[in-house]
Every structure is written in C-alpha cells, then in structure tokens.
A protein has these predicted regions:
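Walker A/P-loop
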Residues: 133-168, 197, 265
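AAA+/P-loop NTPase substrate/partner-engagement loops
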Residues: 158-188, 195, 215, 284
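C-terminal engagement/docking regions of AAA+ P-loop ATPases
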Residues: 338-369
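Interdomain "pre-motor" coupling segment immediately N-terminal to P-loop NTPase/helicase cores
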Residues: 43-99
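Conserved alpha-helical scaffold flanking the Walker A/P-loop in AAA+ ATPase domains
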Residues: 183-207, 238-245
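Conserved catalytic/switch belt of AAA+ P-loop NTPases
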Residues: 207-246, 269
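Conserved C-terminal "switch" segment of AAA+ ATPases
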Residues: 90, 260-266, 277-342
Length: 369
C-alpha cells in the first residue's frame, strides 16, 4: 500500500509539472522571429491565351518580304512585336480589375451602371477557362463634352491595359481598323493589330468615338466594326496589310455616341447602351484635381486650387469637360511660366477670375517624379 501511495504521488507531481509548463506557454507573449519575414503568398499565375498563331505570323513574314522596302517599313516592327511571347498575351486579373472598378465608382457617379456591368462580366470571366474570357461591348451615350471618352480611358486604367481611340466620325474607311492591302500606295497595318501587337494584354481597350456619325459611304467601316463586335468573327479578324488572321475577340470595346437616333441599328443590336449623365459639380471638381495631380507629378510642381475659385468653376455646368481640361492646363502653364505663387485665369462669359496658388512640389519618398 505504501508503495502504491508513493507511485501515485509521483504521477500527481509529474502531472502538475506538465500543467504548469503548458499554462506558462499559453500565457507567455508570442516571440518575434528575428531576421525572418512571413513569406508573402505567391501571386496567382497570369492567364495566357494565343492571339497570334505562329503559322500565321510566319506567313505574314513571307508577305512582308515580298513588299517593297518602303511599304515593308510600316509593318516590320509591328510584326516583330506581334511575335513576342510566341504570339501569346495575358488576360487581366479579373479580381484586381473588379476592385479597381469599385474604386472608380466612388469617383465617377455617372458611370455606376456601366461599371457594374463590367464587374459582372469580370466575375463570370474569372470563373471560366481562359479561352472563354470575354467582356461584352458597351455604348456610352450622352451629350458632347461630358467626358465619355475620358471615362472610357479610366476604365482601361482600372483594367490595367492600354487603350486606343478611333474617331468613327472622321474615319476614312475600314482600313483604319483592318489595315490596307499592300497594293495600296500608302499601305499600312490597321489599328486593331497595332493595338494587340504592342500590348502585353489580350484585352486592351478600343474606344470608337462618335459612332452616331458613321456614314455608309465610308468604305465599309461599319461591317468591319460589326465583325469586331461579334466574338465569333473577331476570333478570325483579318488584317489586310499582313493578309493575316488573329484573335481579337477579347478586346474590350467601348463605343460613344451623342445621339442614339443616328447610331446604325445593326450596331445597337450588338452592344449594351448606357446613358451617361453630365457629371455633378463634386465630380467635376475631382476631375480637375486629378488633372492637376497628373501635371504635378510630371513636372515636379503643383498648383493648388484656390478653393472658392475651383468650386465656382466646377459649378459652371455650361463649361464642358473639354473646356475645363483646357482651362486647368492653361492655368498650370501660366503659373509655371510666370513663377508666381498665384495664377489667375480669366474665363469667358460670366465666370470671374479663377485663382490658383503655386508651390514647389517635392514628391514623397517612393513616389515617381
């Protein structure tokens, strides 16, 4: 019996030691690992698709060699760029793009609906195989000068892709999209292959401005645009200069128009139309500030708006965004040229002098100059 009591005492004491150790470890503050950093999660691999097939680019190279040296110059660099990465291009990161678009919604209230439509497409595109990635084309409809083209550029920025603008009203013909054949005197590649060749993305943004001004006598500009808007035909889009087909079906196409009455019906049937209202004063003020911030970053100087003057100008709804942009840039340039601390711009009509203050701008560490 005495031996059993001694064994029991040992077991109890050992248990107490284990409990004490466990309790002290639980209550102790976590120790920092010196010289070690928590490894960052690996970024998701970029999704890649074939845009320019190797066989097609090889045939295009043969076509190029048969041209005169003068005509060959126009396409040699573009073909070299198209063949980069074996003709493959990356797709936008749909999650990151959707997050960026969400931020844009806070600054561009008049783009809420088209942004939400793009976000819907991005959610679906992310869940599908890379080959199925598509963003449906949209038409931004609104009065002249409300910033439709500017806003389309902001969408490209959110997607992290380059953009190109073509004016449909001034289009001389289909060759602006699909290139002109080598038999033409001024033969050159089209805007579509140029955009994809120079881009690392399979989904750059193509803005076709003023589609309500397309004329039927413009050498078949409309049929080529319709081919580009249809995913099936866009997969085999042909550039006449290179006599080459390539996959343009993932280009994000944004059309703009001032009046829906003059937009060709076949085009309307292929896009979703969004009415873009004129931006309110608060949004206009943010656009002005964005223009100033961009100029500040590029020049190393900043012009700070005199608050009351900037608000007065933002409230002038009769001054469209094109005029607003010109006025802000002019005020910035005048301030830099004069070296004054305050620059004033006299605007036409009833708008009085608009004041800006100039200060040297030193970018914070880590920011580009």
């Amino acid at each position: 019996l005495e031996g059993s009591e001694q064994e029991l005492t040992k077991v109890v004491q050992a248990a107490k030691r284990h409990w004490s150790t466990a309790l002290s470890m639980a209550l102790a503050p976590p120790q920092k690992t010196v010289g070690r950093k928590k490894p960052r999660p690996e970024p998701a691999p970029a999704r890649v698709v074939q845009v320019f097939g190797p066989d097609n680019t090889e045939k295009a190279a043969e076509t190029l060699r048969e041209m005169s040296s003068e005509k060959r110059t126009a396409g040699a660099r573009i073909l070299e760029q198209a063949r980069a990465g074996d003709g493959c291009r990356t797709l936008p990161d749909a999650r990151e793009a959707s997050k960026n678009l969400e931020a844009k919604k806070l600054h561009f209230e008049n783009l809420q609906q088209p942004i939400e439509r793009l976000q819907t497409d991005l959610v679906l595109a992310q869940a599908m195989p890379a080959q199925e990635f598509r963003i449906a084309p949209i038409l931004l409809l609104g009065e002249p000068g409300i910033g439709k083209t500017y806003l389309a550029g902001q969408l490209a920025q959110a997607l992290g892709v380059p953009s190109e603008k073509i004016s449909a009203g001034g289009a001389q013909g289909a060759f602006q999209l699909s290139g002109s054949h080598s038999t033409w005197t001024s033969a050159k590649p089209g805007a579509v292959i140029n955009l994809l060749a120079q881009s690392a993305s399979a989904s750059p943004v193509l803005v076709v401005d003023e589609v309500d001004k397309i004329h039927e006598d413009k050498h078949a500009f409309l049929p080529v645009l319709l081919d580009l808007l249809d995913a099936g035909t866009a997969q085999r889009f042909r550039d006449e200069y290179f006599e080459m087909e390539f996959d343009a079906s993932r280009i994000v196409i944004v059309l703009t128009a001032n009046s829906i009455d003059k937009v060709p019906q076949p085009l309307l049937s292929r896009v979703e139309v969004f009415k873009v209202p004129a931006p309110e004063p608060a949004q206009r003020l943010r656009i002005m500030q964005k223009i100033m911030a961009d100029l500040s970053e590029k020049t190393g100087h900043a012009i700070a708006f005199a608050p009351e003057a900037a608000e007065r100008l933002a409230d002038r709804m009769d001054v469209d965004l094109r005029q607003l942009d010109r006025m802000v840039r002019a005020a910035f340039a005048m301030a830099l040229q004069a070296g004054d601390k305050v620059a004033r711009l006299k605007t036409p009509g009833a708008i009085g002098p608009v004041g800006f203050s100039l200060r040297d701008w030193a970018p914070q560490q880590g920011q580009p100059c």
